[in-house]
Amino acid sequence: MPIGIPKVLFKESTDTTPQWVDIYTRLYKDRIIFLFQLLDDDFSNQIISMLLHLDSESKEELIYFYINSVGGSVLSGISIYDTMNFINSEIVTLCIGIASSISSLILANGKRTKRFILPHSRVLLHQPIMQVSGQASDILIESEEILRLRRILTKIYIENIDQTISRVARDIDRDCFLSSREAKNYGIVDYILTN
């Protein structure tokens, strides 16, 4: 039986009495955003809206981005990546379970020296995957798009993790699972949080 979204007491500085709010609203007030599900257009639009709003409230305060996601739509993830780079607020990223596929790129895109992972968390790198069907000409167009996205992802990874093009291209060719220590050595994160 699902328990629903937990509620917690929260009191705004202007309120006289605390109110019950869902946990995500409460954490959002502390500038914490969660990527905790499969990325699709709707969810990425919510995250982008939150990033833009938090940045408009204060460009000097950090935004905390907690990640526990198996990835999802590459284009949705790239739109979050672009928004992270567009805003002025520095973003702290923290992997609290798994950062697979496009969510690993979002993890790596946090502010250098402010990218974290928990000790037993994992990272998965791999090339873009798309379902392709239709006429031969449509399949060719889709295949070219997948290759273009692969080049874009490789370029974005090397900008964020200081690896060579050949190393990243080789590693994303097949599923590449990384432990927290391996993710740190690879340059996806800067620190492993132990307490």
UniProtKB/Swiss-Prot annotation:
> Could you cite one Gene Ontology molecular function of this protein?
ATP-dependent peptidase activity
Q: What class of enzyme is it?
A: hydrolase
Q: Which PROSITE patterns match?
A: CLP_PROTEASE_HIS (PS00382)
- Intracellular or extracellular location(s): Plastid, Chloroplast stroma
In terms of SUPFAM superfamilies, this protein maps to: ClpP/crotonase (SSF52096)
Does the keyword field hold Chloroplast?
yes
What is annotated as the active site?
101 (nucleophile), 126
Lineage, top-rank taxon, reads Eukaryota
Q: What is its main location?
A: plastid
**Gene3D superfamilies the record matches:** 2-enoyl-CoA Hydratase, Chain A, domain 1
Catalytic activity line of the entry: Hydrolysis of proteins to small peptides in the presence of ATP and magnesium. alpha-casein is the usual test substrate. In the absence of ATP, only oligopeptides shorter than five residues are hydrolyzed (such as succinyl-Leu-Tyr-|-NHMec, and Leu-Tyr-Leu-|-Tyr-Trp, in which cleavage of the -Tyr-|-Leu- and -Tyr-|-Trp bonds also occurs)
The record, for PANTHER family, names: ATP-DEPENDENT CLP PROTEASE PROTEOLYTIC SUBUNIT (PTHR10381), ATP-DEPENDENT CLP PROTEASE PROTEOLYTIC SUBUNIT, MITOCHONDRIAL (PTHR10381:SF11)
State what protein this is by name.
Answer: ATP-dependent Clp protease proteolytic subunit
The protein's organism comes out as Bigelowiella natans
